[in-house]
Amino acid sequence: MKLQTEVLVIGGGATGAGILRDLSLRGIPSLLIEKGDFLSGASGRNHGLFHSGGRYVVSDPEAARECIVENRILRKIAPHCIEETDGLFVSLPEDGLDFRNRFIQACEEAALPALLLLREEALSLEPGLNPDLLSAVKVPDGAIDPFELVLANAKDAEVYGAGYLLHAEITSLVVDGDRVKTVLAKDLLHGEEYLIEASYLINATGAWADQLLKLAGLHIAMALSKGSMLITNQRLTHRVINRCRPPSDGDIVVPNHTVSILGTTSVRLEDAENFEVTPREVSLLIQETSKMIPAIEETRFIRAYAGIRPLFQSGEKGDDRAISRGFVLIDHEKRDGIKNLITITGGKLVTYRLMAEKTSDLLCRKMGVDVSCTTHLKPLPGAEKPSGLKDRLKTLGKVETLCDCELVRREEVEEALREGKLKNLQDILHRTRLAKGTCQGGFCVYRLLGMLNEWELAEGDSNKILKGFLEERWKGIRPVLWESTVKEEELMEGIYKGIFNL
Amino acid sequence: MHYDLIIIGMGLSGLMAAKTAVEAGKKALIIGKGMGCLTLFSNTIDVFGKITETTRLRDDLSRWIYDHPEHPYGKVGVEKIEEALCSFNTFFRPPYTFQSRNETNSLIPTGIGTFRPTYLIPSTMMRGIALKEKKTLVIGFKGYKDFYSQRLADSFECRGTTLSLPESPSTEITATALARWMEQPSFREFIGTEVKKQIRDEELIGFPAVLGVNDPMGVRKDLEKKTGVSVFEIPVLPPSIPGMRIFNRFKERLIQRGVTFLMGYSVSKATLKDKRCEGIEILHPPVTTSYSADHYVLATGRFMGGGLKADREKISDPVFNLPVSQPGSQEKWFEKSFFDEHPIHRTGILTDSSLHPIDEKGELILENVRVAGTILSGHHFLEEKSREGIEIATGYWAAKQALN
């Protein structure tokens, strides 16, 4: 199939979706292409921290300043994606108070509101904290739902005329002189081939940025840093809990809906495709985070996962955390003489909008168009909607729930299917809270597949899809199998290998 | 209170041990936290589904046992396994019986559209074996979200339909609710009439396994009368109504014969001295009660049952703290693929040939304790498809040996 667009945005993470929305609000025709579903990369695999900037305020004040500005904007345009929890930076006896004092001063310099709490004050806000803590500093951290955020951006872009192609991978970039002339792509599910003609291309592929540039014979130095996280079965604290010391392994616990996410590690990777959470990382995360919240030692985990931070390499060796978390915008016209190609990489989820704005500004300059950004003013679709859990609880017993862990109603799934263009199981799981609870989809995916048969939407062999899902689920569960998760697993194996002989 | 035999664990192996004891004229106490995995997973009696030869299972199994003396079956032996199965069957006289077809494994349809090999099949499921040859209609119920007739129809290449039920008090229906309703004549009248309307030229009707807890054959007969077509049951997601039938039958018969049932209790302490168990305690706050017996059977199941406990370091038995074979460190417990055979499933309590607990060196640990059921080491019931067979055989044999 032959497609034409003014701008082709490559990558369906927060950055790509943000750019797609920004451009369409400016009236520039754009098309997004993504080889998986939206959020298949780092955007869907992070700890969901809604940064205040506190985490970088000492090491990278520039990134911190960006964070706090964007933090304020997102509270206005995407309140439905954010839980305003606040965050505490906790000092333990072994940390001393030097870093804390530098931290408070840096917050002041970056105009980041920070309030020093005494031990008793901190413990009364968060009784689960280590009672030996020295003090805590309160900052406006929060929790963000990247799925809601990215899908809302894509939805709004669509309203303003943009399009997107999911599960389609670029196979070749044809360079002719100083331009990328055509793009060849392939639908990974059905094999259809696309020939795309775009006046401009934006490479927003995150960890895959260099891989894409290789197709045009270009290269940038990227460091791929794996960060691993663990999800608990319950929410441990109301607020985000950070360790008040230079960023290190296992120093953050972020509440997320009904669970908490423990993070993170930092391990250099060579390959963006094959990575897993190692037993060493699991032990390290539990050991370190339980110093802040002792109950973590005994808590039940439901899943481990890892994401890749795409870091633009500065050249020095050492801890990847030292590489700036600020973003990098590359005009390949200046750098490589390719006039119609831009790469945007690095950055944080919370600065996705700013990254999109700067990218679109650069593009407009190149195009000679003079339209300004409005994404900081216009709320995202869904912003008027109240938060979900209370509504879910109200419907309990009155409607059919597909997922008993996360109270996902049958109608919600029907709605997601109606809205659209969902091509595989993962697409459905990304758009609902199915498979995100305690049983990790052990029951609800079986039910979902049964319903797809009823609705005559089942494509292919349902049992093969179920097997594929169970394997995918296994990757997340295997690293945390002890105590009650071993029981849960015995149940799942008893069902699928036992009763059902799958 | 003093007993001849105390059985800890109320799953199928514990129940079989209690049956064996009471039939030998002994005074028995059975203690259980719950009904065990019986009411979750058991529908039919698996003995060794892995063997799919068409010859008699007994012959294949004795050949297999010869090469696997460390397996629980190796300790019991084929003759005693058969004896145990016969003993189990004495609780299931017609009309609801468990039978094999030609003394070999048969393939029965499951609630996910696959077939599974099993040995003794309850009367309500037997006709499912013919699903491939006969035109079949599969019935589901709107609001019963654990069974999807259309999905089965797609897999089995037959027809499926979903019935809407009248005046359901909730939008969601459970297997247990359906099983209760099935026992009401008015409900069957409705189902019979609705199903009859749907039948075209089908010779078989498949229902999820919810045809009543107490009198499934009565329910089936009535449905067949109303529809004019043969009816069978299909195993579904837990809970298992057929498993409840087994549990209820044992409970009723054992209590009649004088077995003491302590349900909802777990052992809080065991007093051990000189390789003997001298007594156990049950804490039911604020009261602690002590019980003692000449012999004990430990039949507490695996992880779900609470018989084995896995912390991040090791796997242990919380009742007697018996030696458990360890599958290495935690990262080695499970393989990379969900569908692999995981080393953790082979762990369990080590025993000698008479099911006494022993340590790694073969040293006897407790001379008046026997171990039965899936908590034993050296088997892999999921791979072997041997869950109920191991439970029945070792429960029977543990009690036999203890009371010999």
Model-derived regions: residue spans:
Chain B
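Residues forming the flavin
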Residues: 1-83, 89-404
